[in-house]
Each structure stands twice: as C-alpha cells, then as structure tokens.
C-alpha cells in the first residue's frame, strides 16, 4: 500500500509541480499527501504565467478533484491551505471553484504573488457568479498589485478579456444588455486595468 501511495503521489506531483513556484516544493508535497485520493486527473491546456522574479508557473485548465465540504485538513499551515484552495479553483465544479476563490480572498492569500494567476484565471470563466465574487472580494488596496501582475502577463489578460466578452455575448446579454454594465467589464476595467479590446498595455 505504501508503495502504491508513493507512486500515486509522485505521479500527481509530476503533473502539478509546474503550477507552483519551486520554493513551494515541500508545501506542495504536504498538500498532495492530504489530497492523495481526492485528485483523480489533471487536465492539460496549461497557461503559463510569469512571476516578478522571472520564474514561470503553468496553471492547469481543470483538475478533477473530489470535494469534501466538511473535511478538516488538519496540520496544514496558512501557505499550504492557500495551495489547497488554488488547486480547488481548477475543479470541474463551478460551485466548488467559487467557494475556494472566496476562501482565498477571505484569508488574504492573494498577498502571495503565486496565488494571483489562479484568481485572475477565474475571471475568464463563463460562471458569472465567479466574476461577481472576484469583483466584490478583491481588496481595493490590492488593486495596484493585480495591475502590476496583469501588466507582466498582458497576453494572458488580453485572451481572458476576450473570452469574458464572448461569454457575455453568448450567455448573459439578455440579462445585461449593455456591456458597460456587465460585471465582467467592471472587473477587468476597474481591477485589472483592461478597459477595452485592442488595448496595448496596462498602465
């Protein structure tokens, strides 16, 4: 059993290690141990994000991970809990993604730069409640940090912005006819500094 557990752990770590900075190796191993039989599959389509120190992380599009609402992840410190919540923001279940985004923002985990790509990636979701969660829970004093990170990763922001507009046009135009009033527009403009299509830089 121990051999099988070690094999499973190494297989998961081999796929997910690129999603976090190398300095978090020990913390990530502890989180993966806690989720050893919850993580079933890590789907491809990773998007690369640049950290301010030049290191790159690759966030997976989705992670098939079981969610236990009342489970107590005993023994995990704050940073490790932030890693766990980041993993769940890639869940297949939109309600789970939204809940763990709220937890990340509630605990102020976006003080860690490596948390920001998980939060920002969620702005490209089709679930409008997630956009609302981000807009209403990102602290105003953190906005300069988000904009600096978005500026560093402008191509990703441009693509997410285009996706957000596409989802509005496809799914939400009947409920919010004017794009200027759409929560996604306000999120990208007021928080991330991406005010319009064709914008060349975030200032």
Predicted regions, residues:
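Residue-level signature of the C-terminal ends
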Residues: 103-107, 137, 141, 171
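Buried hydrophobic core positions in alpha-solenoid tandem helical repeats
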Residues: 84-86, 116-120
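Short coil/turn segments at helix-helix junctions and helix-capping linkers
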Residues: 91-95, 121-129
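Amphipathic alpha-helical segments within well-ordered protein domains
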Residues: 101-105, 119-120
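Alpha-solenoid repeat scaffolds
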Residues: 110-114, 129, 141-145
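Conserved hydrophobic register position within alpha-solenoid helical repeats
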Residues: 100-103, 130-135, 198
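Extended repeat-based scaffolds of very large eukaryotic assembly and lipid-transport proteins
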Residues: 2-99, 142-203
């Amino acid at each position: 059993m121990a051999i099988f557990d070690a094999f499973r752990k190494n297989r998961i770590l081999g796929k997910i290690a690129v999603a976090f900075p190398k300095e978090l190796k020990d913390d990530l191993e502890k989180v993966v141990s806690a989720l050893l039989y919850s993580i079933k599959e890590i789907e491809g389509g990773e998007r690369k994000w640049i950290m301010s120190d030049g290191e790159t992380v690759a966030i997976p599009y989705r992670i098939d991970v079981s969610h236990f609402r009342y489970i107590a992840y005993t023994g995990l410190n704050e940073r490790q809990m932030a890693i766990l919540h980041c993993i769940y923001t890639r869940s297949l279940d939109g309600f789970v993604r939204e809940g763990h985004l709220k937890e990340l923002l509630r605990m102020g985990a976006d003080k860690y730069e490596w948390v920001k790509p998980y939060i920002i990636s969620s702005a490209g979701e089709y679930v409008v409640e997630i956009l609302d969660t981000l807009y209403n829970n990102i602290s105003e004093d953190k906005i300069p940090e988000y904009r600096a990170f978005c500026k560093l990763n402008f191509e990703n922001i441009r693509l997410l912005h285009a996706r957000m507009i596409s989802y509005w046009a496809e799914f939400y135009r009947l409920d919010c006819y004017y794009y200027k009033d759409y929560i996604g527009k306000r999120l990208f403009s007021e928080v991330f500094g991406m005010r319009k299509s064709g914008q060349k830089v975030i200032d």
